[in-house]
Structure formats: C-alpha cells, structure tokens
Curated annotation (Swiss-Prot):
Disulfide bridge positions per record: none
Protein name: 3-dehydroquinate synthase
InterPro entries: Dehydroquinate_synthase, DHQ_synth_AroB, DHQ_synth_fam, DHQS/DOIS_N, DHQS_C
Pfam entry (one): DHQ_synthase
Residues that coordinate or bind NAD(+): 66-71, 100-104, 124-125, 136, 145, 163-166
Cofactor: Co(2+); Zn(2+); NAD(+)
Gene source species: Staphylococcus saprophyticus subsp. saprophyticus (strain ATCC 15305 / DSM 20229 / NCIMB 8711 / NCTC 7292 / S-41)
UniProt binding sites for Zn(2+): E178, H242, H256
C-alpha cells in the first residue's frame, strides 16, 4: 500500500507493506553520506538486515538507546557532535529506524545538523505509524514533553510491517492507542469495527488485519495535516487524549500510548461535563481492561501535580488549558477547560479506579 502527502509542494511517499525496506535503497543511493540511526532493541532483533543495509550503502550506523531517554538536550548534544566529527556534508541523509522516539530524535537531528539535512522515517512500531507521518520532530525539556522541536518533513516514510513481528505486547498496547484515537476521530463505525476486531488481549496480540487499521489511521492523519501542517487549527484534533496523557506520561514515565489511552478516558469525562455528552465511561474502562492495559498507576495520581504539567502543554494559549474533546464520535473540537472542571473530571475519573 502506498500513500502520498498532498501539500502544495515538497510531498513525500508513505509505503506500508511487508518487505517495504526493499524500497530504501532507491531513496538513498545518490547521497554522499548516509547515517542509520537505530534503536538498540531493533538493532538487536534485526542486526543482520541492518548490517546488510549499512554495508550495501556504504553507510554509517549509529545505535541509540531505546525510548524517550534519547530525547534530552544532553544526548542530543552528544549525538550531533559525534555526527559533526564525521565531517558530513549537507548531502547527507539520516535514516530513523525505530519507534516514535527514534523518529522524533533523528528528525530533530536532521532539522538542525548543518542547518538541515534530509531524513527518512523507517518506523518499527505500531505507535510510530502516527509519529512518523506529519513532520513533527523534537526532544523533551525538564519543563515537559516535546517542547523543543520543529516541523520538518521526511523525504519518505518506509513502514515495513515485518518489524512488528518482534514487538512485545506492551509496545503493541502503546501503539494501539493511536490507532484507536484515529478511529475515534473518524466515526462510530470505525470505533465499532476496531473494537470488534480486537475485543481482548489475545485478539490484539495476534495483530490480525492490523495493516488495514494502520492504513486507515495514516489516511485519517493525512486528511487532517494537509489542511493544517503547523497545528494552528484542525491539526490540534490529533492531540485527542494527549493533554492529560502527556502529563501522566511525563510524571510517571509510562509508555506513551498507555498514557494516551488514560487521557482519552479523561477526555470523555470532561466532554460529559462541559459538552453535555453521555459517554459510557465504564464501557471504555472495561475495554482497556479487556486489552490488559496496566492501569494500576492511576491509583498514584494527584491532581495538582498533573494540572501543573497540563498548564505547560504547548497547545495552550493565554486563556489556559486547551483540550480536544469529542462532541460526538468523529466530531472533535478544541475547548478551553478551567481548573474547576478539570478537577471535577479528575475526581470522577479516579473514583472509577478506587480499590
């Protein structure tokens, strides 16, 4: 399957299939220098393939730690200095091979190395079907997640579904949150279909027909970002579940998608309060439990600390916390939410998880 962005210019292909990695050579063969930036776990599981790609293209290979630990100023400085030491030219292409954090980090390296070199996304997780598309790159700050970054498009996204074969279930859960989010942004039929396809842990772990749902997720995101690349309007819809989710992720250091799923539940409660919707919160909580999302962390939540982190969310403005809420499934809108409402929603939320 192949998609393509539809900006006015500077578009890029998105290839989603088994053996998609076979297309990589055609994109990088003419560069003077190529650097593979590889997640350490991916390198461990796929070292023979990656060594072949490195040698075939006379490339450099840089192995980086897995996950968010890479997305710090100190690691960024260390890495970009090591790249500069290789005396690379602007005719360089960086290739991000890993999950969302690897793509975010490598994209930010590319955006800033020599004032900008090309890069290609090779996502290896379900989660990265979301982050690899759309051109957001960046690292974290002590003040919050993804607060240092840029909008910087890749030259291609090459999504080889073979990489999903080695994903542990906790990573499947993390990625599924973004797939489910895209269904919520579509319509009730999309939500019913995905819940029917993956009603429990066994079904989700099988990843049966995941290609279809990944394709639909990417398609949903593309339809939004071509209208609003720089997140001034409708692109904010893609942050469904992320205002509260990012705060939870940052404070408790849990996987991104686990936190986003928690944020989606919280969003439903806020919607019920201020939009007069009637979402069945128990249904969504039970669905998360049926998939075996680890929800024990919720018993450690404290409102004021999470509220402080929500205040630092980069989507906010002078009027305060902005959240993406669902007026109905498939009908997102951005609303300012005051502290009293957030606190009320938090009390309702935590009541559902009391021992």
């Amino acid at each position: 399957m192949k998609l393509e962005t539809t900006y006015k210019s500077n578009n890029y292909p998105i290839i989603v299939e088994h053996q998609a990695i076979d297309h990589l050579h055609q994109f990088i063969k003419d560069y003077e220098d190529v650097v593979l930036v590889v997640d350490e776990h991916v390198n461990h599981d796929w070292h023979e393939l990656l060594d072949f790609i490195t040698s075939e293209n006379n490339a450099h290979k840089l192995i980086i730690p897995s996950g968010e630990t890479t997305k710090t100023l100190s690691f960024y400085e260390k890495t970009i200095e090591s790249l500069l030491a290789k005396q690379l030219t602007r005719d360089t292409c960086l290739i991000a091979i890993g999950g969302g954090a690897t793509g975010d980090f490598t994209g930010f390296l590319a955006a800033t190395l020599l004032r900008g070199v090309d890069f290609i996304q090779v996502p290896t997780t379900i989660l990265a079907h979301d982050s690899s598309v759309g051109g957001k790159v960046g690292i974290n700050s002590k003040h919050g997640k993804n607060l240092i970054g840029a909008f910087y498009r890749p030259k291609a996204v090459i999504y080889d579904l073979n990489f999903l074969e080695t994903l542990p279930y906790t990573e499947i859960l993390s990625g599924y949150a973004e797939v489910y989010k895209h269904a919520l942004l579509n319509d009730i039929t999309s939500v019913n279909n995905i819940e029917a396809q993956y009603p429990n842990e066994q079904a989700l772990a099988s990843l049966k027909d995941i290609e279809y749902f990944l394709y639909k997720g990417i398609e949903t995101k593309l339809n939004i970002i071509v209208q609003d690349e720089k997140e001034s309007n409708v692109r904010k819809y893609l942050n469904l579940g992320h205002t509260f989710g990012h705060a939870v992720e940052y404070q408790f250091k849990i996987p991104h998608g686990h936190a986003v799923m928690i944020g989606i539940i919280y969003q439903f409660i806020v919607s019920n309060i201020i939009l007069n919707t009637h979402y069945d919160i128990s249904h969504y909580i039970q669905y998360l439990k049926s998939l075996n999302y680890p929800l024990e962390v919720i018993q450690s939540f404290e409102f004021n600390s999470l509220y402080g982190l929500m205040l630092k969310d980069k989507k906010n403005d002078q009027q305060g916390v902005q959240m993406v809420l669902l007026n109905a499934i498939g009908d997102p809108q951005v609303k300012h939410v005051d502290k009293a409402t957030l606190s009320q929603a938090f009390e309702i939320f935590t009541t559902h998880f009391e021992k």
